[in-house]
Amino acid sequence: MAVPWLVLLLALPIFFLGVFVWAVFEHFLTTDIPATLQHPAKLRFLHCIFLYLVTLGNIFEKLGICSMPKFIRFLHDSVRIKKDPELVVTDLRFGTIPVRLFQPKAASSRPRRGIIFYHGGATVFGSLDCYHGLCNYLARETESVLLMIGYRKLPDHHSPALFQDCMNASIHFLKALETYGVDPSRVVVCGESVGGAAVAAITQALVGRSDLPRIRAQVLIYPVVQAFCLQLPSFQQNQNVPLLSRKFMVTSLCNYLAIDLSWRDAILNGTCVPPDVWRKYEKWLSPDNIPKKFKNRGYQPWSPGPFNEAAYLEAKHMLDVENSPLIADDEVIAQLPEAFLVSCENDILRDDSLLYKKRLEDQGVRVTWYHLYDGFHGSIIFFDKKALSFPCSLKIVNAVVSYIKGI
């Protein structure tokens, strides 16, 4: 009986080492590290760890042990959360939706500014615990009441779970601002990555809601604002740049929208979108809307392949405004609150920010744009990770803080 256990104990280290070696090889064979990125060795290390954990998660999923998303979330939620003596942090539930409330302890002579925060993570990663440090910092430095919303994620929940949970929790909070000591004229909606998509979609959905306080401003940190044009210059230039490759994004997009992975190539090639739809939205999606300086490297003009009706029937909900808020009607865009947009040069989603910026400005919406030439997708989450932090991480956080304090 002891022999099988001994063999297993000897085999496990070899297995884990083998997976790590494979992850390192995959990184160096498939990953691009642009020259503008600072601390490239640090980013390489983080990406190798990321690939290692995702690969382990996928193996565990195939063995029926645990799904990859749940495995990763278990790991990042195991990090100890530090208490801040300046804040009261309370975990609540708005119906079935978990939320975390950050409130300054210091007395205030007037109602405070409110922030509603939607975290990122491609609907795969991210949680209240994972983004605790960032939200804690934002609440403390801006002296605001901050509500972070924990929405349902993969693999158990698909579209429109994120939108529904963030929308319902936001409405609940907006109806109870007085309870939390929040000034209804100073509510900011903030989100990162797919959380930025939620910001865009929810601020649009709240347009015309006379029964709720009007959102004062929206903060979108490298958001994804459209789900069907994946050949923009930044998608081509940064398709293999960590921490969000085009391949991983398309896979996550298909999983969240419940699209069979066999249609990934059709989505990449644009064959799942009818020609008349391309013509309708070309004015908003055209690379001509992107400044020339962003198209100087690694971009080849592109046009969609022949229309595939079967792919369209499978993936047509990509065109819903909840999933692609960039294509909302002008009448809706014109009524949106002012925006603070963060984009990173080394990010496949850079051009989403640039295109949404133009859409807002064309409709008279005030936009403050903050672009980081040394930035990459997901960098903000490392701002408080000390040795694993990057200069761009703190730059983004401080820029967001400075903007919100001006509200």
Curated annotation (Swiss-Prot):
GO molecular-function terms, A-Z: carboxylic ester hydrolase activity
Alphabetical keyword list: Glycoprotein, Hydrolase, Membrane, Signal-anchor, Transmembrane, Transmembrane helix
Record motif Involved in the stabilization of the negatively charged intermediate by the formation of the oxyanion hole, residues: 119-121
First-listed, main subcellular location of the protein, grouped into a coarse class: membrane
Segments crossing the lipid bilayer: 5-25
SUPFAM superfamilies: alpha/beta-Hydrolases (SSF53474)
Signal peptide: none
Segments on the Lumenal face: 26-407
Protein name (record): Arylacetamide deacetylase-like 4
Organism of derivation: Homo sapiens
